[in-house]
């Protein structure tokens, strides 16, 4: 598998020497060293676990330059040069590879080439030797980290603890901070909100992890993760909303309105500051933050209103949530007051922070990054938003229907608010908050309107995209192309806005579902983020803006292949329109004339079968007779060459329904029995990545070829028939009358291999996402007025 590397910054020899000397790897007087002595010195420096010269000398015998000579014996010969094979046999051993198991002595560079590991052809003098070691230190080891990070995990950089300054290597910050002395403290930031209606502004508990060196005058940036889950969650799966019910007449919609909570102006900072008096008991919960904390970046967590240690009630997705989370950045920037405890008597400032803040986090944590970025809050320099919601309507609704995130049937805004209302765990807080919490829950249940599923002012207040013009910070979005929890149109739609803005922006799309990507084999994402944060938050010019393409997309056939694109949109491909035939085929010249019908039975058979939603979906897309019966399927011939679908497919369907209401679902599926990638990354080296020195670990993982399957969902979408004219306004419809639907599917970037077919499936009830009616309904599709349009690359 290829260990692709994008974060290595090309560096001239003089700068290589400077950096190597700065980390005590290369002797300052290297010019007077002979080749043999310098080679021995550099190899021994790389053996970071050996702490004395005697121990390092003993270790040399554990390495071999060939199938008949150890490194120790080779050095005894006082060589004046080293062959490429000899050098990289040793290099691969330093990188954690095992001879005879991973590679052969006879061809180390062949192995490196196959795995996208860099190497130099000529190592015949001291200068070339130094450059070879510089590149080796920046080469990804078997555990996915560069060798320098592997050495850090063995204690190499403890020699610099206490020096009270950052150090950089190849444009990235290195772990020279004493992780045994990390300051872990809690403060309380005052907001301008009163969501619990007690007449006082809500306080937000903020947990800070920062280098001890900041107590000695060093100012550092902060990586802030706004996590409503940080204080714990209240499990409520058994109280999910019932989805086994008939569809309602959507004209009952009454456009529920959003109303902001009371404003209570917070105190202004008075210029005084005392140290925090409460120690943090929660641990940092995000490996990327921990990794950067060892490299000098403070890690800050806050759950915002309603979470444990904070005042207020949860109002999922509302402006109040955004405002309370943004208040933390205002404090870090010096613009808002915080106290040492909840008595509000002693102020404390973030005088250790340099005023530059970045944000990290996935899912809800990524969502709040988008929300806060739209406020243009001062101090926020960059966001790295993973699997984020850009409109809560697009999370819980679609085209006039109630739609569940994957594996969350029956969940909604009110239940997510309950899940995150962790301040109810503290008895004193419970007594104060519970009555206001109950009122807010009642409001959320009423206004989210599960009855009709329609867009409203309530949902408009939760659409961050409509405030995108407030974004001032640089931008990185990360999303899984197979994320059916936070569906891909959330990132696609915000990207279409961000890409037109002047600030620097990047997009990563991986093959996962609702997953992080910082520890994948196929890309050095953590190193890229190190480079990025150093540039954005420390102001170091390190070529970060030019280091990798604007859009990086992981291939769905080969996990170690990343497509480098200028954008993600329909413009990447050529428009193609496919039409169904009366015989169930799908062609560009299809000429279907018939009216084909199917009868949807809602969730009745699904409930009887007792299978999971994911099992149903696989059987359904494969064409299992029982589950495919309530649908129409149209298939292409086998593709004769690989074809990539890019952007958002669009479907047009002329349909009538036997009832004056209905829902239509459409799926695009790849058919063909073959090995496909695992749905989630496989763990390859559990706990194999050290985040610092004895400072936590992460696990190397990657998507790998799995057992053969018959089909793979590419994309899908759903629509309420009563929105045939307007996605934001329902109309009454008549039974047995045809209506034209025109809607977009989830965006994708999917390669159909030669030998596979493409299927268009038209159906109604999606057992995992839509409501599951208790009554039968017959749908008739007019094939002459039905088509699927997408863009091929």
Curated annotation (Swiss-Prot):
The keyword Endoplasmic reticulum does not apply. Its EC number is 3.4.14.11. Coiled coil: none annotated. It is found in: Cytoplasm. InterPro entries: AB_hydrolase_fold, CocE/Ser_esterase, Galactose-bd-like_sf, Pept_S15_Xpro, PepX_N_dom, PepX_N_dom_sf, Xaa-Pro-like_dom, Xaa-Pro_dipept_C. SUPFAM superfamilies: alpha/beta-Hydrolases, Galactose-binding domain-like, X-Prolyl dipeptidyl aminopeptidase PepX, N-terminal domain. GO terms for biological process: proteolysis. It comes from the Bacteria. Keywords: Aminopeptidase, Cytoplasm, Hydrolase, Protease, Serine protease. SMART domains: PepX_C, PepX_N. One of its GO terms (cellular component) is cytoplasm. Its main location: cytoplasm. It catalyses: Hydrolyzes Xaa-Pro-|- bonds to release unblocked, N-terminal dipeptides from substrates including Ala-Pro-|-p-nitroanilide and (sequentially) Tyr-Pro-|-Phe-Pro-|-Gly-Pro-|-Ile. GO terms for molecular function: aminopeptidase activity; dipeptidyl-peptidase activity; serine-type peptidase activity. The active site is at 363 (charge relay system), 483 (charge relay system), 514 (charge relay system). HAMAP family: Aminopeptidase_S15. Removes N-terminal dipeptides sequentially from polypeptides having unsubstituted N-termini provided that the penultimate residue is proline. Homodimer. Belongs to the peptidase S15 family. This is Xaa-Pro dipeptidyl-peptidase. It comes from Lactobacillus helveticus (Lactobacillus suntoryeus). The lineage of its organism: Bacteria, Bacillati, Bacillota, Bacilli, Lactobacillales.
